[in-house]
Amino acid sequence: MKVIFMGTPEFAVPALKKLITHHEVKAVFTQQPKAKGRGLNLAKSPIHQLAFEHQIPVYTPSTLRNDEIINLINKVNADIIVVIAYGFIVPKAILEAKKYGCLNIHPSDLPRHRGAAPLQRTIIEGDRKSSVCIMRMDTGLDTGDILMKEDFDLEERITLEELHNKCANLGAELLIKTLANIDNIVPITQPSDGVTYAHKLTKAEGKINWHESAYKIDCKIRGMNPWPGVYFSYNDKIIKILEAEYLNADHHFTSGTVISDKLEIACGSGILRVKKLQQESKKALSIEEFLRGTNILKDTVLK
């Protein structure tokens, strides 16, 4: 099958690799190179780099909402468009430009966690099950019909990186199965109940509220690393918690109280045991390394 691919980050790479192996990728659309590092050198997106290595034509428009881009897509000899974490809204004229429309990989149990941050919200909300869906896109926000879906259980303390990799690889496999059977698949309309939205994360969400349960804070730590990160302030410095574990232990302390010299912190319910953290502008440290240089005394109440 002849394919136009639209995507940008690492999450989309396994799918493009599979398409290059099993189909004919006629063109790739991705976001423009961005300045990175101290030298602010322009860096291609992971998808741009992969397409470049395979000599696939790459386009980096600043928007899809103009006639020039729509005409370009119409001229590309393709049967279908695959869109994965592209970063731009796809207008109706492009959704309908090819025989089989536009397909999307969405890493959640739709209609739960529609929107920009399904992986993060899955972990933050403490979900114990999830899915990867192959969806035929329409003009709504992740409202299209489901062509193929695979459910799976989540490990209790899965990290964002682990869930990202699992869904990216599973989505790539499902995409190839979908394309192989696309003429025989009966699309399934998403149910109207159970709809939730996985809104984009904000930096403010990362500030710890010690009145929440230790379990909830641990979910946020795993779901918000690396960005925005979960943090507290101490001596006017921002400190990110990169890894912790929660203890379902009763206590009588005020929320936010440091109850041991190993940085165990009383929460609204339970206790958070910090294992790895990072002070602003410094490298990540284990709790042992951190406490050798920064002494957060027992009975301190963190804000």
From Swiss-Prot:
InterPro entries in UniProt: Fmt (IPR005794), Formyl_trans_C (IPR005793), Formyl_transf_N (IPR002376), Formyl_transf_N_sf (IPR036477), Formyl_transferase-like_C_sf (IPR011034), Met-tRNA-FMT_C (IPR044135), Met-tRNA-FMT_N (IPR041711)
Pfam families per the UniProt record, alphabetical: Formyl_trans_C, Formyl_trans_N
EC number: 2.1.2.9
Species for this entry: Rickettsia rickettsii (strain Iowa)
Gene name of the encoded protein: fmt
Chain residues that bind (6S)-5,6,7,8-tetrahydrofolate: 108-111
A molecular function GO annotation: methionyl-tRNA formyltransferase activity
Catalytic activity: L-methionyl-tRNA(fMet) + (6R)-10-formyltetrahydrofolate = N-formyl-L-methionyl-tRNA(fMet) + (6S)-5,6,7,8-tetrahydrofolate + H(+)
Protein's UniProt keywords contain Protein biosynthesis: yes
Keyword Protein biosynthesis attributed: yes
Keyword annotations from UniProtKB, A to Z: Protein biosynthesis, Transferase
Membership in a protein family: Belongs to the Fmt family.
Protein's name in the database: Methionyl-tRNA formyltransferase
GO CC, alphabetical: cytosol
Known role: Attaches a formyl group to the free amino group of methionyl-tRNA(fMet). The formyl group appears to play a dual role in the initiator identity of N-formylmethionyl-tRNA by promoting its recognition by IF2 and preventing the misappropriation of this tRNA by the elongation apparatus.
